[in-house]
Design a protein with these regions (language model features):
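Acceptor/aglycone-binding surface of glycosyltransferases and processive sugar-polymer synthases
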Residues: 66-68, 72-80, 93, 106-178, ...
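Short beta-strand/loop segment that forms part of the nucleotide-sugar
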Residues: 14, 27, 36-45, 62
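A conserved acidic beta->alpha catalytic loop
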Residues: 43-52, 103
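Cell-envelope/extracellular polymer assembly enzymes that use nucleotide-activated donors
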Residues: 9-11, 38, 187
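Short beta-strand-to-loop acidic/aromatic patch adjacent to the donor-nucleotide binding site
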Residues: 87-104
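Conserved donor nucleotide-binding strand/loop of the catalytic core
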Residues: 51-90
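Hydrophobic helical membrane-anchoring modules
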Residues: 1-6, 177-236
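Short, well-formed alpha-helical segments that are part of the catalytic scaffolds
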Residues: 18-32
Length: 236
C-alpha cells in the first residue's frame, strides 16, 4: 500500500448499525490512516453496544435514535465534520472518506482511496476490492445498479455498490440531498458524473463480512434492491 504523507486533510465517516463486534477494529485501523484527522461513527439506531465500542476505540460518535438509513447516516457524519472544521477555523474543508463499519483491520488499507483526491486528480474515488467474497443474492442488485449508472452516464463501474468512497467536500455538497438508504452509492455516481465531476475507481485490499444466504440476508438484499430502484427511477 502507498500510504502517502501524513496530514489532517481527511475525515473518516463510518455509518454503523449493530456492528459492536467489528466497529472497534474498524475504527482503530481507520485512525491509523496517515491522512485521517478524525473518525466519525454515526450509530444509525443500533440495538447493541456499537456506540460504546466505537467511542472506546477513539471515534467521535453521533447517534440516531432510530434507524434512518445509510444515506441519512452519511449526511449526519458529513455535518459533524463540517462543524468540526468550523470549530477549528480551517481555511478549507476536509475531504470525506466513507468506510463500512464491518471492514475490521482491513480499514488500514484504505489509504489509496484518498490519494487521487488529495492530489486533486479526482473529485470522488470508489473502491474496487482486490479480493471479493460471494454475497448471497447480491448479483441482482449489483446488476441493476451498474446497468442504471451505465444508462444514465455511459460509464460502467466495476463495483457500483461499493460504499468505500473518498469525496471532496464540494463533490459531497454537489450530490445533496443524498438518495435514500441503500440507493446512495448508485445516486452518487450518477449525480456527480452528470455534473461533470471526476470519478475514478481505485483497487484496494479491503474486505468486509459476507451477508450470507439466510432469510435476514435476503431481506437486506430486498431493501437494497428497492432503494436502488427508487434512486434510479428519479434519475432515468
Amino acid at each position: 500500500m502507498s500510504a502517502g504523507p501524513a496530514s489532517d486533510e481527511v475525515a473518516v465517516v463510518i455509518p454503523a448499525r449493530n456492528e459492536a463486534d467489528r466497529i472497534q477494529a474498524t475504527v482503530t485501523a481507520a485512525l491509523g490512516l496517515p491522512a485521517a484527522a478524525v473518525v466519525i461513527v454515526v450509530d444509525d439506531g443500533s440495538a447493541d453496544g456499537t456506540a460504546a465500542a466505537a467511542r472506546s476505540a477513539g471515534a467521535v460518535v453521533t447517534r440516531h435514535a432510530r434507524n434512518r438509513g445509510k444515506g441519512a447516516a452519511m449526511e449526519t457524519g458529513a455535518e459533524a465534520v463540517r462543524l468540526l472544521d468550523q470549530r477549528e477555523r480551517r481555511d478549507r474543508p476536509r475531504h470525506l472518506l466513507f468506510l463500512d463499519a464491518d471492514l475490521g483491520p482491513t480499514a488500514a488499507m484504505a489509504g489509496p482511496l484518498t490519494e487521487p483526491v488529495l492530489a486533486g486528480r479526482a473529485d470522488m474515488t470508489i473502491a474496487v476490492f482486490a479480493t471479493t467474497v460471494k454475497l448471497g443474492g447480491h448479483g441482482l442488485v449489483v446488476g441493476l445498479s451498474g446497468a442504471g449508472i451505465r444508462r444514465a452516464t455511459g460509464w460502467q463501474p466495476a463495483q457500483p455498490l461499493n460504499g468505500q468512497r473518498c469525496l471532496t467536500r464540494a463533490a459531497f455538497e454537489a450530490a445533496r440531498p443524498l438518495a435514500r438508504g441503500w440507493g446512495v452509492e448508485t445516486a452518487l455516481s450518477i449525480d456527480l458524473l452528470r455534473k461533470g465531476l471526476r470519478v475514478t475507481e481505485v483497487k484496494v485490499e479491503l474486505a468486509h463480512r459476507a451477508t450470507g444466504t439466510g432469510m435476514r440476508a435476503q431481506l437486506h438484499r430486498a431493501h437494497q434492491l428497492t432503494d436502488v430502484a427508487r434512486a434510479l427511477a428519479t434519475r432515468l
